[in-house]
Regions:
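Catalytic domains of riboflavin
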Residues: 1-382
Length: 382
């Protein structure tokens, strides 16, 4: 058991190793997320180990929507298109179309037995797209490659636990609700874990576990660059999951327990960044570097996002609406939640643990910060 703190109270959670062992043995665990995110708990199990009894348990005592997290690769193999083209869910939960297994004894698709068969079919290498009826009663979720190191959601946690247990990277999850229909929070989830003798762990601890064992970035360049703002140290990192290249520019040296002025920036093309550093003026960039020069030390990260095209389309849609309402201001390009984990790993490599975050928007709490080994100690307007 390990201890975690919430609302100034110490609560006992299980270790990630204990949870992996239970997943390997076909048991259900409870996974809780950050209180600043959904602040909920899910029953989680490996899809490979699913049984009708497990589905019935989840439906009876979880009471939420039973879903099956799958890898991007598996969703593509089964031709599972996204439920919607424009995902406006605040947590960006990636629902595909719902499905049922055709034939194989499946009737209505909703019984515990039918749903267990459908889940099993999703990981069966012989299952073809035609074998799955659409819509149905099982809701696949497309997980981000890289797991909780990319996105700190139950979807990715389920995939990570299955993979760490040596099983097919697919899971079964369901939100846990109280008997009165309200969402179960950590105190109630602890009671559920005790009642059914189930291990309970946090995504935060899973992130920390994976940070110790895995990395999604490789440093490719490290040199001093002369910019319009003076000398800065440039490090380039390549993401192992998609080969995107991200850049960190730093000034000065620091200790790990020292709060560091930091800006994490989203960008479309790194070539434009390099041009701006040496030639072209950019007001916002000027303000960032001026702040760091005045401070004497700091870091600016430029994170290339995987969904550049969709991000641009979303911004254009917002711009169109703003123009129709007489608003001239263009929508900002915001940091994608699912890419925050990449920036966190880069900050970790830069020996930055405490952050004075430069921002020109509202103060946004990031989930799983402790798991990443990071703490935002202040927000600095620039």
């Amino acid at each position: 058991m390990i201890s975690t703190k919430t609302n100034n109270k110490s609560i006992q959670l299980n270790t990630i190793e204990e949870a992996i062992e239970d997943i390997k043995n076909g048991k259900v665990i409870i996974v809780v997320d950050d209180e600043n995110r959904e602040n909920e708990g899910d029953f989680v199990a490996a899809a490979e180990m699913v049984t009708p009894e497990m589905i019935n348990f989840m439906a009876t005592h979880g009471r939420g929507l039973i879903c099956t997290p799958l890898t991007e690769k598996r969703c593509k193999e089964l031709e599972l298109g996204m439920m919607v083209n424009n995902n406006t869910d605040p947590m960006e939960t990636a629902f595909t179309v719902s499905i049922d297994l055709r034939g194989k004894g499946v009737t209505t698709g909703i019984s515990a037995s039918d749903r267990a068969k459908t889940v099993k079919a999703l990981i069966d290498k012989d299952t073809k797209p035609f074998d799955l009826a659409r819509p149905g009663h099982i809701f696949p979720l497309k997980a981000k490659e890289g797991g909780v190191l990319r996105r700190t959601g139950h979807t990715e946690a389920a995939i990570d636990f299955a993979r760490l247990a040596g099983l097919e990277p697919a899971g079964v999850i369901v939100e846990i609700m109280n008997e009165d229909g309200t969402m179960a929070r950590l105190p109630q989830l602890i009671d559920v874990a005790k009642k059914f003798d189930i291990k309970i762990v946090s995504i935060e601890d899973l992130v920390a576990y994976r940070m110790e064992h895995d990395s999604l970035i490789e440093k490719k360049e490290d040199f001093t660059i002369l910019t319009r703002f003076g000398d800065f140290r440039l490090r380039a990192y390549q993401q192992t999951t998609n080969n995107q290249v991200h850049i960190a520019l730093t000034k000065g040296v620091w200790k790990s327990d020292e709060p560091i002025l930091t800006r994490v920036n989203s960008t479309l093309v790194n070539n434009d960044i390099l041009g701006t550093l040496t030639n072209n003026a950019d007001k916002k960039l000027d303000q960032m570097f001026q702040a760091i020069n005045e401070n004497g030390k700091g870091a600016i990260l430029f994170i290339n996002q995987q969904n550049q095209a969709q991000n641009l389309l979303n911004r254009l849609h917002i711009l169109k609406e703003n123009q129709a309402e007489g608003e001239m201001k263009a929508p900002a390009m915001t940091m994608d939640n699912k890419d925050f984990g990449i920036g966190a790993q880069i900050l970790h490599d830069l020996n930055i643990c405490k952050i004075e975050l430069m921002t020109n928007t509202q103060q946004t709490k990031r989930v799983g910060m402790i798991g990443y080994g990071l703490e935002i100690v202040d927000y600095i307007k620039y």
